[in-house]
Amino acid sequence: MLKLETITKKFGDKVAVNQLDMIVKPGEIMGLIGQNGAGKTTTFRMILDFIKPDQGQITWQGVPITQDIKQKIGFLPEERGLYQKLTIEEQILYFAQLHGMKRAEAREDLVRWMDKLEIVGKITDKVQTLSKGNAQKVQFIATLIHRPDFLILDEPFSGLDPVNTSLLMTEIKNLKANGAAIIFSSHNMSGVELLSDQLTMLKKGKVVLQGDIYGILDRFGRTQIYVESDVSDTDLAAIS
């Protein structure tokens, strides 16, 4: 279980995340939503121990995040990080070996994932030759090739058409069914509703809405949730 307790992070005078509490259990998906600058990426960076919170504690299975625990996390960053001149095989095996996987085992998993994501026959293609959608699929495989227990997915559907978005959603649901704890951010609100068990909405680093997705839908109906804004801050999340 991932647990964030009263997490606060400041950059100078700006409060990026303000007393955030959140729990993500194995076999559960948390949707983290909010406009750009709401604190989602900062939250991900603190979970990954890239930056430290100024206040509060983050634990996985009751233990503070360590290097060993980080090996159990799969992270899909919003800014994709593929090496353009490598083939798909070279790329994925490189990431797998960073996590201590044996080459043969990793290649077997790669072939299986390429079949699931419908990019069979491209294993020797260089990343730079791939369409945006196929490159996104390869990035997804890189995120989970080491069989992580916990996934952080930052805008996983960016660049995907509806068919491939649905394909990726199916695999995320399968990972959840196999016990993975998953937290993801997305501006695709229909995807948030379809995938999430729990929902957290941030505005300027503070939680403005949190709870079971069906409880939220029962409370507000299948409509639009408006968050009070100022002139420089327009924020609208639709759950429909």
Question: Can you describe what each PLM-predicted range is?
Answer:
Residues 56-69:
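Conserved ABC transporter NBD signature motif
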Residues 93, 97, 104-122:
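Conserved ABC ATPase "signature" region
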Residues 126-130:
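Conserved ABC ATPase signature
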Residues 151-155:
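Catalytic Walker B motif of ABC-type/P-loop ATPase nucleotide-binding domains
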Residues 169-240:
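ABC transporter nucleotide-binding domain
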